[in-house]
Amino acid sequence: MRRRRKMEAGAAARAWSLLWLLLPLLGPVCASGPRTLVLLDNLNLRETHSLFFRSLKDRAFELTFKTADDPSLSLIKYGEFLYDNLIIFSPSVEDFGGNINVETISTFIDGGGSVLVAASSDIGDPLRELGSECGIEFDEEKTAVIDHHNYDVSDLGQHTLIVADPENLLKAPTIVGRSSLNPILFRGVGMVADPDNPLVLDILTGSSTSYSFFPDKPITQYPHAVGKNTLLIAGLQARNNARVVFSGSLDFFSDAFFNSAVQKAAPGSQRYSQTGNYELAVALSRWVFKEEGVLRVGPVSHHRVGETAPPNAYTVTDLVEYSIVIEQLSNGRWVPFDGDDIQLEFVRIDPFVRTFLKKKGGKYSVQFKLPDVYGVFQFKVDYNRLGYTHLHSSTQVSVRPLQHTQYERFIPSAYPYYASAFSMMLGLFIFSTVFLHMKEKEKSD
């Protein structure tokens, strides 16, 4: 028996020793960041776009670089996604390698994956089809966005090196960043949004003088995109909170554009020592890869005022208190969300109560009186704001009518009816008394 105990103790000690030896090896695996597949036209893009990729690595992203026609490409294996994010920096690809195609990427988006796409004037059919799936329509191949009033001084003469003003950005700090930006350099293909798709976001538009056409041909027909309808960068947040960003310019993410000075060719234009491309690219990547604008619901509670636990059923006209915790992802940590426009609805089929929630400490709460209607209701919070994930919380409760012992003996509002009833009784009594005791006069012959 002693020998067995010694053997078991020795085995346990060896197991603990082995575990401590494996911990350093397991640590990097557990601490790895979001798995991101990067598809490139050629691997040289790792050098020409190194600043953007370095910003992702500095945020602990695990990047896997492959050419877009690599025969070993795969997004899904045994029904599970191999990556959390997808970056497509291969605008000219005609066919993806391996088992990746537009349908696979659409399935990846439907599964909640995030996709960042950069196109150019040499755009292939796969990216065009992917854009159509997401409500974005690219212009024809070899076309470019042209602006004869807002081009850079270093433009070669076709006026396709566009200087986009920060005023043309979407007014959503969660998506484009909260700091003021310098003008943005853009050279690439134009896009237009599907007017029937309310999920498409016009992140960066062209100026009123921009249009999309072949830069080396005279204009013989109305351009595909004109003025503010010309999209330079567009986004999409699907109903399942999956996010996609389309940029019409691959050069937008390049080191050359990040470090370039920028100045409009118009006389008297201000010169900036650096573009705002880097700051905008980082902000877009943080949003599309769900580092910004991600909300979640924490504990939810409801009870009568003065109590702490929810009842089996509420009674009509009860005074209740509802509270909910809403958190936001910030720098990898969940912190309390700060908002002043969160509403609560008390819904049966239609809302009977709609009121704002007020922040108290780390939660949002409100007190209100239940309607004088019984049935099955829901406490519903449906928060859908630009740049944030769709937040939804519903809690079902029952509301019953008053019990017989809970009604008032006399209802003040019914006093007129009481008076009419008693007056009717009194009148009937007087009439009966008079009628019974009244003696008719005898008729004389």
UniProtKB/Swiss-Prot annotation:
Residues annotated as transmembrane: 416-436
Pfam families noted in UniProt: OST48_MD (PF23358), OST48_N (PF03345)
Entry's localization field: Endoplasmic reticulum; Endoplasmic reticulum membrane
Lumenal side: 33-415
GO biological process: protein glycosylation; protein N-linked glycosylation via asparagine
Source species, domain of life: Eukaryota
Cytoplasmic side: 437-445
InterPro entries, per database record: DDOST_48_kDa_subunit, OST48_MD, OST48_N
Keywords: Endoplasmic reticulum, Membrane, Signal, Transmembrane, Transmembrane helix
Quaternary assembly: Component of the oligosaccharyltransferase (OST) complex. OST exists in two different complex forms which contain common core subunits RPN1, RPN2, OST48, OST4, DAD1 and TMEM258, either STT3A or STT3B as catalytic subunits, and form-specific accessory subunits. STT3A complex assembly occurs through the formation of 3 subcomplexes. Subcomplex 1 contains RPN1 and TMEM258, subcomplex 2 contains the STT3A-specific subunits STT3A, DC2/OSTC, and KCP2 as well as the core subunit OST4, and subcomplex 3 contains RPN2, DAD1, and OST48.
Function: Subunit of the oligosaccharyl transferase (OST) complex that catalyzes the initial transfer of a defined glycan (Glc(3)Man(9)GlcNAc(2) in eukaryotes) from the lipid carrier dolichol-pyrophosphate to an asparagine residue within an Asn-X-Ser/Thr consensus motif in nascent polypeptide chains, the first step in protein N-glycosylation. N-glycosylation occurs cotranslationally and the complex associates with the Sec61 complex at the channel-forming translocon complex that mediates protein translocation across the endoplasmic reticulum (ER). All subunits are required for a maximal enzyme activity.
Family to which the UniProt record says this protein belongs: Belongs to the DDOST 48 kDa subunit family.
Protein name listed in UniProt: Dolichyl-diphosphooligosaccharide--protein glycosyltransferase 48 kDa subunit
